[in-house]
Structure formats: C-alpha cells, structure tokens
C-alpha cells in the first residue's frame, strides 16, 4: 500500500513539476498554460509538465521544429509559435499532438512544412500560416481537417492551388489568402469559381489578384476574364511511319498519340514489356531518331523513340517489345490516357488462318482491309489489342536500292480488333 501511495505521489509531482526555467507555468480558466514567449529562445526547452494544454513560444528565435519537439506535451490544445525564425518543420514534429485545436505559425520564414503531420490533427479548428514563404500546398494537405473553421494563408508565395484543396474543409467559415503572387492560368480558374460560389468568408478579395501573366497583373481573381482552358484528351492511333524521321532498315512499329488540351499538355509514354516498365517523357529523340541531350540511351538511337509530334517508334520490333503501350497527357486541369496491347506472332502460331477466323477485315474504298495509307484508330473496348504477324516475301522488282541491289520485303498484318493493317517494309 505504501508503495502504491509513493507511485501516485510521483505521478502527481510529474504533472505539476516546475516549468523549464525560462518559462512561466500555471492554471488559467481551467487550462494548464506554459508561457515561454519573449524569452529569446533558440530551441524548444525540455521539462514541461505533461498536463500542459496551452504552450506559447511566440516571439523567440526558433530556427525550426525538429521531430518529436513536443513529445512531452501530448495533451496540447493550443500551440503559439508566431514571430520566430522558423524555416522548416520536420516530419513528426506536430503529428503527436492529436488534441490540438489551435496552431499559430504565422510571421515566420516557413518554406518547408511537414504537411503530412496535419493528417493526424483532426481536432484542429484554427490554423494560422500567414506571413511566411510558402510556395506550394499539396492537394491533400487538409484532407483530415474536417473540424477546421479558420485558415489563414495570406502573405505567402503561393502562385497556384491544386483543384479541390479546400474541399475537405467542411466546417470552414473563414479563409484568408490575399497577397499571394498568383499565376492566373487555367489552373487557378477552379478557385475563382469556388470562391464566388462558397459561403466561406474570404476577406480582402481585391487583394487576391494576379501577378502573372503580365497582361493580367493586378486583376482580382473574382474579375478574371474567361480563359481558353480545356482538360487533356488523347487518341492513340497506329501508323507505319511518322513525319520526317530517318528510319533504320527493318521492321518498325509506329504509334501516334494525338493530344489536345489547353494549356498544351505534357506527353509521357508508359511502356510495360516482359523486361520491365519504361517511362519516357516525350520527346527523347530529334527528327533524325537520335537521342536528345539528356535522354537515356546506350546508343545513338534509343530502343523506344518518342518524337515531338506525338509519335512513338520501336525499331526492330520483336518479342521483347511486346506489352502495353500507353500515352498519358497532363496539364493543369487534369490528365487523360489511352493504351494498346501489342503482341507479336508468326504465321506458324495461327497466322492468316487465325486472322480469317477471329477477325474480319473492314472494307475501305473497295479494299478488303486497311493498307499502309490508312490510319487505324480503336473504336471500342474490343479494339485495344494489336497482334503483328510477320512473313518474308521475295524481292519485288520495283524495290531497288540506290546501288542497284534488290530490296528484301517484310510483310506484316496488324490486327486491330475488327480491323486489319497490312504493312510492307523493305530491307536494303
């Protein structure tokens, strides 16, 4: 019994033990307060009572918040850190404070912030991050803050906002976001629409204005004129050649990704083959098929050649190049993707007999199937598989090399769902 009493006393003493020497601690209005403001501190002092619910470290010289900075005070409900020199907040610095309702980081030098820590602060009602150097907010930064009522982001360096950033803030009643250098391109149009329709109080709307482009500088977002904006769209087609490229002799598979959207989307190719996945930021070659500076290639011509016009060439197509070919277009308004599965077979593996039984040629201008002059595009879910059948033909009399040598012809059939594409290539 005596041991139990001693243990209880030890716990009580821990809860009410003195504050760190520079700070004052006490109870006020039912809250356990630790006041360390204006103490010229350069770090969070250790030794706080575990029952502290309000901690003020405002007006000090804190340069940053390390991981576990507030591990001693897990019951904190209010944390005041304004007017310091905080440049960064490490991941894990704030995450343990699951009871936090008010967080003030205003008037610092914040350029890096542990946005993921906010996911654990679901009780937060007030978040002040104004007067910092923040240039970017992740789309999911506030995804767990359904109780947040007031958010202050004014006087930062924000130039863009990801669409849907404020959608999780269902309790939000006050948003201050003025005096940021917004880039008034298509990516900001959603915020104008949201702000005009929202019941959230947004003060100083005349100071929520464009900084770029120059022609729109100073115009408030609420009076932003209509912009020619559209989300990306893609159409993947299959062609036996592309404009202006110098092709090597041999069989070449050519795909073309027709991209539309405003602003002009960025095009990427995602290629999944038996040997692994290849990611290509288009273009990676010039019009001569040679690798551009900075493109990864072990020789003058990469295995997969992505051209600026949206074409993708695969020289010497073979079994190792079988797989799924996807083109992905992305701009500020979203992304779009189209894919095709490509498989290579020989006539001995089904050949023309399989063609006749499984697929039917589509007549085009009296022809029984598509020719090299026709571009084929998938018309439905069944048209997303390309099977290439190769055969060798004798040298045609009309195909003669510059030095008089006859050319060898390689013929092929591309099966595109319900369509056929007959290809002929000449090897000199």
From Swiss-Prot:
Its main location: secreted. Keywords: Disulfide bond, Glycoprotein, Immunoglobulin domain, Leucine-rich repeat, Repeat, Secreted, Signal. The keyword Repeat applies. It comes from the Eukaryota. This is Immunoglobulin superfamily containing leucine-rich repeat protein. Residues 180-231 form the LRRCT domain. PANTHER family: IG(IMMUNOGLOBULIN) AND LRR(LEUCINE RICH REPEAT) DOMAINS, IMMUNOGLOBULIN SUPERFAMILY CONTAINING LEUCINE-RICH REPEAT PROTEIN. Residues 19-50 form the LRRNT domain. Residues 1-18 form the signal peptide. InterPro entries: Cys-rich_flank_reg_C, Ig-like_dom, Ig-like_dom_sf, Ig-like_fold, Ig_sub2, Leu-rich_rpt, Leu-rich_rpt_typical-subtyp, LRR_dom_sf. SMART domains: IGc2, LRR_TYP, LRRCT. Detected in thyroid, heart, retina and spinal cord. The keyword Signal applies. Disulfide bonds join 257-327. Glycans are attached at residues 51, 309. Pfam families: LRR_8. GO terms for cellular component: extracellular space. LRR repeats lie at residues 51-72, 75-98, 99-122, 123-144, 147-168. Residues 232-343 form the Ig-like domain. It is found in: Secreted.
């Amino acid at each position: 019994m005596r041991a139990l009493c001693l243990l209880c006393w030890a716990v009580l003493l821990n809860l009410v033990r003195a504050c760190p020497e520079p700070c004052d601690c006490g109870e006020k209005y039912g809250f356990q307060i630790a006041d360390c403001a204006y103490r010229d501190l350069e770090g969070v002092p250790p030794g706080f009572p575990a029952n502290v619910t309000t901690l003020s470290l405002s007006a000090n010289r804190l340069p940053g918040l390390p991981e576990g900075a507030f591990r001693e005070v897990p019951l904190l409900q209010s944390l005041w850190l304004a007017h310091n020199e905080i440049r960064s907040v490490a991941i894990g610095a704030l995450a343990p404070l699951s009871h936090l309702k008010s967080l003030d980081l205003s008037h610092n030098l914040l350029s890096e912030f542990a946005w993921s820590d906010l996911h654990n602060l679901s009780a937060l009602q007030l978040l002040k991050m104004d007067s910092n150097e923040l240039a970017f907010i992740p789309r999911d930064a506030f995804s767990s803050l359904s109780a947040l009522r007031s958010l202050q982001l004014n006087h930062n360096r924000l130039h863009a906002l990801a669409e849907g950033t404020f959608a999780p803030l269902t309790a939000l009643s006050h948003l201050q976001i003025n005096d940021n250098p917004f880039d008034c391109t298509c990516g900001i149009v959603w915020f104008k629409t949201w702000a005009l329709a929202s019941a959230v109080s947004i003060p100083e709307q005349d100071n929520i204005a464009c900084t770029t482009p120059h022609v729109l500088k100073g115009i408030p977002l609420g009076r932003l004129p209509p912009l020619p904006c559209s989300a990306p769209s893609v159409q993947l087609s299959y062609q036996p050649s592309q404009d202006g490229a110098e092709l090597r002799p041999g069989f070449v598979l050519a795909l073309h990704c027709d991209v539309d959207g405003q602003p002009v989307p960025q095009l990427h190719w995602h290629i999944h083959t038996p040997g692994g996945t290849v990611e290509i930021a288009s273009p990676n070659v010039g019009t001569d098929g040679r690798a551009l500076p900075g493109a990864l290639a072990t020789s003058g011509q990469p295995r997969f050649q992505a051209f600026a016009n949206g074409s993708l060439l695969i020289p010497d197509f073979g079994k190792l190049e079988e797989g799924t070919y996807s083109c992905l277009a992305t701009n500020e308004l979203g992304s779009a993707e189209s894919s095709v599965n490509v498989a290579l077979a020989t006539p001995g593996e089904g050949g023309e007999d399989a063609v006749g039984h499984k697929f039917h040629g589509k007549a085009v201008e009296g022809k029984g199937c598509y020719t090299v002059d026709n571009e084929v595009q998938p018309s439905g879910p069944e048209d997303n598989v390309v099977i290439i059948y190769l055969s060798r033909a004798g040298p045609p009399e009309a195909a003669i090399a510059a030095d008089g040598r006859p050319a060898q012809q390689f013929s092929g059939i591309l099966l595109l769902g319900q369509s056929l594409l007959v290809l002929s290539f000449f090897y000199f």
